[in-house]
Amino acid sequence: SLTRLCHALIPSMKRNGGDIINLSSLGALLPIPDFAVYAATKAYVSSLSEALRLELREHGIRVLAVCPGPVSTGFGKAARRPGFTGNMMPGRNAFDTSVETVVKDSLRALSRGRARVFPGMKIRLAALLLSIAPLGLIRFFMGRRPRKVLPAPNDSPSSAS
């Protein structure tokens, strides 16, 4: 796990130096129906990174949480089940960020000693808006986003398509 890996490497990093870059997500800032575990896990990654950053700064170890939105990698398409057509939020691709932008912005943020980075202009703007929007408004919109279609309770997983 991320926690074990970080704690296993920290003693050596204190002696020899190094940096930690953890991959979080813009989703860490949101309550996401049908993706609650994902959002909560990414919030954990961000919080762990922030705490480690404070703990390790006296040792010269920089810690960065990278919080991208959707990244243009092709992974999403490859990971879908055959015939899967649902659960694509309208306009989602408008927020895609290139891998190159994520890497460039992340390395720049690390060199500047930042705690978090939201790579790409659109994701930075989204993060800014989320930071000033009332939580009730965020809940309202997230509660109305397209949802997964789940099989009926009496359907077996093998009969659901």
What are these regions (language model features)?
Residues 25:
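Residue(s) in the substrate-gating loop at a strand-loop-helix junction
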Residues 8-17:
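A short helix-coil junction within the Rossmann-fold of NAD(P)-dependent oxidoreductases
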Residues 6, 41:
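Active-site helix of classical SDR
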Residues 113-145:
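A transmembrane-helix-recognition feature enriched in membrane-embedded lipid enzymes
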Residues 32-36:
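Active-site loop immediately N-terminal to the catalytic Tyr-X3-Lys motif
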Residues 12, 30, 51-62, 72:
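Active-site-adjacent segment of SDR/Rossmann-fold oxidoreductases
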